[in-house]
Amino acid sequence: MFAVKVKICGLTNYGDAAAAAEMGADMLGFNFYPKSPRYIKPADAVKIIDRLPAFVDIVGLFVNDTFGHIEQVIDECRLDWVQFHGDETPKYCEQFGTLNVRTMKAIRVKDEKDIKLAEEYYTDAILLDAFDPKKYGGTGLVFDWNIIGNISKRVFLAGGINAENITKAVELGIYGIDVCSGVESKPGKKDHAKMRKLFDMIQDLRG
């Protein structure tokens, strides 16, 4: 039996968000990075968030954004989590400790040195994603999970997670998984059949 949190990221419409929540998602992610194909304006995200059940945590993804703008979106969208998915430093992330929000730093992993970097961040969680020189997340790439080792923080695993590799991901003993492109029909649009298959498998693993 495995207890693992499930985060569905890159949501752009109510139908996908509601379906993810109904299927069992613990966290729903909205991408506020304008250059992403999954970008959603905060004003549009609010319209979706307002209709979602209270039991799901709302996560806002940002890339190299300003403190002021992120603080504004936290208030506007009533975010539970802020996910830093760019080149944010530990010092930059620490300043959000004054706000009523939990924080998660994404580490884009190339090798074991990047895994060690996770220990430098005093965030509520660490998200390990595959490195891509041109993209900040949502690439569908998978890094070598065997190098993860022991990290003294809550670890979310991202990068190409789907129904085919979910069992191996969960067996790593991580805190949560972050799924985006693995359950999409195209960037920003979820494939509900893929989501259902994924959640059915997770339910079996949870026991």
Spans of features found by a protein language model:
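Conserved N-terminal beta1-alpha1 strand-loop-helix module at the mouth
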Residues: 1-207
